[in-house]
Amino acid sequence: MNTPIADFVRRYAASDAVRFHMPGHKGRPFLGCEPWDITEIAGADALYEAEGIIAESEKNAGALFGSRRTCYATEGASQCIRAMLYLAVTAGKSRTVVAARNIHRAFISAAALLDLEVVWLWPEESRSLCGCPISEKNLEQTLSALPEPPAAVYLTSPDYLGGMA
């Protein structure tokens, strides 16, 4: 499988082109990775309007993952969590999301920004501040107590300690 982004960046770094673009270090080594640190320059594609090497790389990743489509994102999990919640609540009529207590902090800000009603799943037992073991029974009881199905159920699994929901 070809690696369009890595190949482009390697070629660009090796070209010793004068950089009149961001980032400000201009590719001069300080930590060692600067020659490969670029922005949306000609040929590098644009993440949110991918048509070139990023689109090709996403297509390759999708084939590797066996998914219909793969989209790269910035900001780690936070942006993806916000997008997921937005899509979940705009796809249906419910603004309720059921969530375990060990959620990512981006969930809290997304829930506030989207004005969601969060129904918390309480673990049957808690062995730590980070763990939140949720059983199938616990989830079924919570869902059956709701007047209507939620827009989504948000579980972190495996959790930060390796526990599975």
Where are these regions (language model features)?
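N-terminal "arm"/small-domain region of PLP-dependent enzymes with the aminotransferase-like
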Residues: 1-52
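Short, acidic/turn-prone active-site loops that include or flank metal/cofactor-
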Residues: 102-105, 122-128
